[in-house]
């Protein structure tokens, strides 16, 4: 079997998504269903097309222009990255501004610290 016949053209891909925090449980379920249950989750804040919110605290008005989001990272070799991205997109979708973004990036190498395995074997 050639590399072109393997998922991700024989390489390793990082699927990184910035999503609403309340959609994390749905995304985790969707990832498990497509065979990519391993993930890293980080709380982040950022700004995109979602409008800023004006609030008051102790009589002072202020603008919140950085919104709380969750970054989900999933490294895959045997599961097609497009399938992972589609699963995240379907699970995180609300149709409103601020649903997030998904990026697919190549991974040059992976090393499993415990075993020393590298490349696809480490994923």
From Swiss-Prot:
GO terms for cellular component: cytosol. The modification O-UMP-tyrosine is found at residue 62. InterPro entries: N-reg_PII (IPR002187), N-reg_PII-like_a/b (IPR011322), N-reg_PII/ATP_PRibTrfase_C (IPR015867), N-reg_PII_CS (IPR017918). It is found in: Cytoplasm. SMART domains: P-II. Keywords: ATP-binding, Cytoplasm, Nucleotide-binding, Phosphoprotein. ADP binds at residues 49, 98-101. AMP binds at residues 98-101. Binds the effectors ADP and ATP. Also binds AMP with high affinity, raising the possibility that AMP could be an important PII effector, at least in archaea. The change in the ATP/AMP ratio may be more relevant for describing the energy status in the cells than the ATP/ADP ratio alone. ATP binds at residues 38-40, 49, 75, 98-101, 114. Its main location: cytoplasm. GO terms for biological process: regulation of nitrogen utilization. Pfam families: P-II. Homotrimer. Interacts with the glutamine synthetase 3 (GS3) in the presence of 2-oxoglutarate. Interacts in vitro with Amt1 after ammonium shock. May also interact with Amt2. Involved in the regulation of nitrogen metabolism. Regulates the activity of its targets by protein-protein interaction in response to the nitrogen status of the cell. Increases the activity of the glutamine synthetase 3 in the presence of 2-oxoglutarate. May regulate the activity of the ammonia channel Amt2 via direct interaction. This is Nitrogen regulatory protein GlnK2. It comes from Haloferax mediterranei (strain ATCC 33500 / DSM 1411 / JCM 8866 / NBRC 14739 / NCIMB 2177 / R-4) (Halobacterium mediterranei).
